[in-house]
Regions:
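Short, contiguous strand/loop micro-motifs
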Residues: 5-6, 73-76, 221
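A short acidic, often aromatic-flanked loop/helix-cap motif at beta-alpha or helix-coil junctions
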Residues: 38, 72, 119-122
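Flexible, solvent-exposed extracytoplasmic
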Residues: 20-24, 28-31, 89-320
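Residue-level "edge-of-site" marker
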Residues: 35, 70, 103
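Short, glycine/acidic-rich beta->alpha junctions
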Residues: 10-14, 79-82, 90, 219
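Extracytoplasmic
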Residues: 1-61
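Luminal/periplasmic acceptor-recognition loop/helix of membrane-associated glycosyltransferases
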Residues: 53-95
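Repeat-unit-sized solenoid/scaffold elements
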Residues: 49-66, 103-108, 121-123
Length: 320
């Protein structure tokens, strides 16, 4: 352990400077390799001391491509198939920056930006967190069939021409649409026509907030504006001030239908009301419990009557 600490201390200045630079750059995700599934990758040997650089980047709270400690989201499973030789994969995940050890080779579109000791920082031109796409296929099914479908789509030519099938998961597949089974997606995608088609328009600008993304878009033909963030029903969209439905697009990103014209689109993550109530209750409860232990039985009775009683009633009304 002492040897690990000495090595980490020796490389800490370079990493600190790298992290500071990444925070100063325009918003975008960082690619520093992937955690692999049974095959060798340069990330496996990219360490400072006894800690992987990939893990250090994640613990800094930076927006990363790829998983490390968990794969709860649908997107995180698929990212292990990221192909660093294909520009469309960088664009798909908005992998705008690359961190890699010196000597690691990349395609020409991965441009050197700055070196920090033995760490190289690169930049890739992408469309940002938004893109205008099409969706000519619709699949419905469950999570067990999602990974084979999404990984076959990612390996195909469809991401390169911005063809993103719509996915209806679980109960959502019981809508008026007639989706193909998600279990059939591998075969269907392998036979799908890959064609670019005319321009769909331009994402003129984007703003990134803590729980929101906003874009000004000029659309030339009916399209879906895709936000490169994992789909969840708590994401709410407004187009020109009007609340609009969202859909899930491969590889589990958020899509909003747009007609031709200029539009201002806002997507916000809004936690459910009950979850917020429980979160606030949890924050309030811990210090109040500590006080109740200090003040004794009288405070406990007051706390139960004046605090827990009204909150319990609020939760019951919410369920009712």
């Amino acid at each position: 352990m002492e040897g690990c600490q000495k090595l980490e201390d020796a490389g800490s200045n370079d990493l600190t400077a790298l992290f500071e630079k990444l925070r100063q750059l325009p918003p975008g995700r960082i690619y520093a390799g992937v955690t692999t599934r049974g095959f060798e990758h340069w990330t496996d040997d990219y360490y400072v001391g006894c800690t992987s650089v990939l893990a250090r980047l994640h613990t800094e709270g930076l927006d990363m491509v790829g998983r490390i400690y968990q794969s709860l989201s649908l997107t995180s499973d698929v990212q292990v198939n990221f192909d660093e030789q294909r520009w469309e994969h960088y664009n798909l995940f908005n992998a705008r920056y690359v961190v890699a050890p010196e000597g690691q080779r990349f395609p020409d579109f991965v441009k050197p930006l700055q070196q920090f000791g033995r760490h190289n920082l690169y930049q890739v031109e992408t469309t940002g967190y938004f893109d205008l796409v099409s969706s000519d296929l619709t699949f419905g099914g469950g999570r067990i069939d999602f990974y084979p479908a999404a990984s076959s789509w990612l390996a195909s030519g469809l991401p390169g021409v911005r063809q993103h099938p719509t996915v209806l998961m679980g109960s959502a597949s019981g809508t008026n649409e007639r989706p193909m089974p998600l279990s059939s997606a591998v075969g269907v995608i392998s036979k799908a026509e890959v064609s670019v088609g005319p321009s769909r328009g331009t994402v003129l600008s984007e703003e990134v907030g803590s729980n929101s993304f906003e874009a000004d878009v000029s659309v030339e033909r009916d399209s879906l504006l895709m936000l490169k963030v994992t789909y969840h029903p708590n994401w709410r969209a407004t187009v020109d001030g009007v609340e609009t439905d969202t859909v899930m697009l491969m590889p589990s990103f958020i899509g909003v239908q747009l007609p031709p014209g200029d539009h201002k689109v806002l997507l916000e993550y809004r936690p459910r009301r009950l979850r917020m109530i429980l979160l606030i209750l949890g924050v309030l409860t811990l210090p109040l419990i500590a006080l109740s232990e200090m003040r004794g039985e009288a405070f406990s009775r007051w706390f139960a009557l004046r605090v827990m009683g009204p909150v319990s009633g609020l939760v019951n009304r919410h369920h009712g």
